[in-house]
């Protein structure tokens, strides 16, 4: 059995950034395992621009952004395996994988970084009524067909869900000559970034219908029409509000789910809100030496944030490999309440964390003219006003190690939404 200091499951933006960071922090024995035929992950099919503004201070396409991190990995001589599927990860950091060249094989790692990304919610998970004809795709599948395979999924399109991929595909299909009839969103707010709503829908006069969902799909061999209806506060269709659209394609952009089947096999505890691992300030899970970063941890808005998080995971994994398990330190829980759905990380160690720590979270509804309040126990520490907050846009709070040191008896940190 081969042994490595660090094994990274996933060769997308998170895995690449984590590998480069670990190498820069003194770890030479690294293996990246990627199930696709090339490194780069989902970025290879994201040919639109908007990437890299935070990381490189310039606007790049997805493949351009990926290529920069691929070059970092190649320049550092980091080993990787393509077309290789990880089958199991054990709590003692034994990774079982398989490919055509090696068959099924095992590698033993001193530390493992989970960077598997996320998957789209399928039609089966949505329980959409109607027939099951050809022409129903997830937005990501349609994106791959158009941008990488050179196939056009359809000519008249209805999109269910206003996640970022759905919004971007509304624009992409329009640019390729299709007619996007409508984008329907179950919730009373969009699930995507405000800039994508403006650039992908408003600029192309594509209607967005909030609080609407698909109630029927017509067609036996191919989609012929889709009926949408308004939903009430209980998210159930309101009779008499149905609208029928003739179309040959239905795209689904109804949320992303972190790919954590392997995490479960290792015994990693998952957050029921994010469906991703519960981590501390070093992005370490409840299993010693297993770290998580990127969309497998929680779904991000920007790949730049994924790279920042993954670089931190790589550095922290390197420290673990060189120094062993960190000494037992006081653990403080971060509590998300009053409009805050979750926080990443969930736990911090005030004496062991970096000088500053970014805590990222999402709100549960649209808030206007409110503030993000941070409490140490019951004492208000900071209150930052925000004109608008929405579930589609990630928020953050910066914790200062020096400030935390002033509260040696701290038992909890609370982050909540309050009136400004």
Go through each PLM region and give its residues.
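FAD-binding core/adjacent interface of flavoenzyme oxidoreductases
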Residues: 1-9, 67-156, 232-240, 251, ...
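Beta1-alpha1 glycine-rich phosphate/pyrophosphate-binding loop at the start
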Residues: 4-68, 72, 144, 148, ...
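A Rossmann-like FAD-binding core segment of flavoenzymes
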Residues: 68-97, 174-261, 355-387
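Predominantly flavin-linked oxidoreductase catalytic cores and closely associated redox partners
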Residues: 104-105, 111-208, 213-222, 289, ...
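FAD-site-proximal beta/loop scaffold in flavoenzymes
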Residues: 114, 136-146, 249-300
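Mid-to-C-terminal Rossmann-like scaffold of FAD/NAD(P)H-dependent oxidoreductases
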Residues: 304, 312-384
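Exposed aromatic-hydrophobic patches
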Residues: 360, 392-404
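Short, aromatic- and glycine-rich surface loops/edge beta-strands on solvent-exposed regions
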Residues: 372, 402-420
């Amino acid at each position: 059995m081969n042994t490595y200091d660090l094994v990274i499951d996933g060769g997308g933006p998170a895995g690449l950034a984590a590998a480069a960071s670990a190498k820069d922090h003194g770890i030479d024995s690294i293996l990246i395992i990627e199930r696709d035929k090339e490194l780069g992950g989902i970025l290879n099919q994201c040919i639109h621009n908007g990437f890299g503004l935070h990381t490189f201070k310039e606007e790049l396409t997805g493949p351009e952004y990926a290529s920069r991190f691929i070059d970092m990995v190649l320049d550092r001589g980091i080993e990787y395996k393509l077309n290789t599927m990880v089958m199991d990860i054990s709590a003692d950091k034994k990774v079982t994988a398989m490919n055509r060249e090696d068959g099924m094989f095992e590698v033993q790692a001193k530390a493992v970084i989970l960077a598997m990304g996320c998957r789209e919610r399928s039609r089966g998970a949505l329980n959409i009524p109607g027939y099951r004809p050809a022409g129903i795709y997830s937005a990501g599948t349609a994106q791959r067909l158009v941008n990488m395979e050179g196939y056009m999924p359809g000519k008249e399109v209805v999109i269910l869900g206003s996640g970022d991929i759905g919004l971007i595909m509304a624009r992409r299909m329009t640019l390729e000559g299709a007619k996007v009839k409508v984008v329907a969103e179950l919730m009373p707010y969009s699930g995507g970034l405000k800039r994508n709503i403006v650039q992908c829908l408003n600029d192309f006069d594509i209607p967005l219908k909030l609080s609407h969902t698909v109630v029927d799909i017509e067609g036996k061999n191919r989609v012929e029409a889709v009926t949408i209806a308004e939903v009430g506060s209980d998210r159930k269709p309101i009779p008499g509000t149905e609208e029928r659209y003739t179309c040959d394609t239905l795209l689904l952009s109804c949320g992303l789910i972190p790919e954590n089947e392997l995490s479960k096999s290792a015994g990693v505890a998952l957050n029921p809100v994010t469906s991703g691992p519960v981590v501390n300030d070093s992005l370490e899970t409840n299993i010693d030496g297993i770290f998580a970063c990127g969309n497998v941890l929680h779904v991000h808005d920007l790949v730049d944030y994924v790279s920042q998080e993954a670089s931190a995971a790589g550095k922290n994994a390197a420290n673990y490999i060189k120094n062993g398990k960190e000494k037992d330190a006081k653990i403080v829980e971060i509590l998300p309440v009053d409009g805050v759905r979750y926080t990443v990380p969930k736990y911090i160690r005030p004496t062991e964390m970096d000088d500053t720590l970014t805590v990222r979270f999402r709100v549960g509804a649209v808030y206007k003219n409110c503030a993000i309040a941070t409490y140490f126990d019951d004492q208000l520490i900071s209150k930052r006003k925000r004109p608008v907050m929405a579930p589609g846009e990630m928020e953050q709070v910066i914790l200062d190690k020096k400030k935390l040191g002033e509260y040696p008896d701290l038992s909890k940190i609370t982050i909540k939404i309050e009136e400004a």
